[in-house]
Amino acid sequence: MASSVVVALLVLLSLSGLEAIQHAPKIQVYSRHPAENGKPNFLNCYVSGFHPSDIEVDLLKNGKKIEKVEHSDLSFSKDWSFYLLYYTEFTPSEKDEYACRVSHVTFSTPKTVKWDRNI
């Protein structure tokens, strides 16, 4: 009985230590298919390698938040860092600019990464 209590306490202490670890997210913005003006596509923002799990991700069109956005479930890697995919259907054009804005405790201000249609 006493040994199981000690093990439980050690597990709780090690898990509470995970909250102190902070890793900034890596942000990748890309389209599902090569960009063609006027042709429907999907805009993806893959955010990975972050800890803790609290994060805010927005897809932007010309600096304004896109409302109809879907995302994957929050998942974690073997190193206990987290990852997410946010995506939306869009139709690229020469005049529009798309980006992904991420807010996380590791950033003093939100970080915005622009979509490069040539990638």
UniProtKB/Swiss-Prot annotation:
Family under the similarity heading: Belongs to the beta-2-microglobulin family.
Protein name: Beta-2-microglobulin
Keywords tagged on the record: Disulfide bond, Immunity, Immunoglobulin domain, MHC I, Secreted, Signal
Keyword Signal listed: yes
SUPFAM superfamilies: Immunoglobulin
Subunit field text: Heterodimer of an alpha chain and a beta chain. Beta-2-microglobulin is the beta-chain of major histocompatibility complex class I molecules.
Species name: Callithrix jacchus
Domain Ig-like C1-type: residue ranges: 25-114
Disulfide bond sites: 45-100
UniProt GO MF annotations: protein homodimerization activity; structural molecule activity
Alphabetized Gene3D superfamilies for the sequence: Immunoglobulins
GO cellular component term of the entry, any: external side of plasma membrane
Record's function text: Component of the class I major histocompatibility complex (MHC). Involved in the presentation of peptide antigens to the immune system.
Subcellular location field: Secreted
Keyword DNA damage appears in the UniProt entry: no
Domain of life, per lineage: Eukaryota
One example of a Gene Ontology biological process annotation: multicellular organismal-level iron ion homeostasis
Principal localisation: secreted
PROSITE patterns: IG_LIKE (PS50835), IG_MHC (PS00290)
Pfam family, one: C1-set
Segment forming the signal sequence: 1-20
